Amino acid sequence: MIKHLDIVWTNQFKKDYKLAMKRHLDIDLLDDIIRKLACSEQLPEKNKDHALTGNWVGHRECHIQPDWLLFYRIENDLLVLTLPRTGTHSDLFGK
């Protein structure tokens, strides 16, 4: 049985999503990754999914494109996919 996760969009993620659309990024790529995560599917290796450390410990990051990232967290006991941020490396890390 496939478990489907409820998706929680933070207010910051909503702003980041609108910014991605304004930048004319391919939103379908982001939506496809969100769908895969919500359906508990493993992401392809090209997305470089990995755990984060520091201020983002407990979250994961995957690459939508080389300089377009998605931060997310899956809370298994609640079956919730939380989407705190998306953006470029400089948007997210200030570099």
Which sequence ranges carry the predicted segments?
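Basic, Lys/Arg-enriched alpha-helical interface segments
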Residues: 1-66, 75-82, 90-95
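Residues forming the ATP-binding cleft of Hanks-type serine/threonine protein kinase domains
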Residues: 87
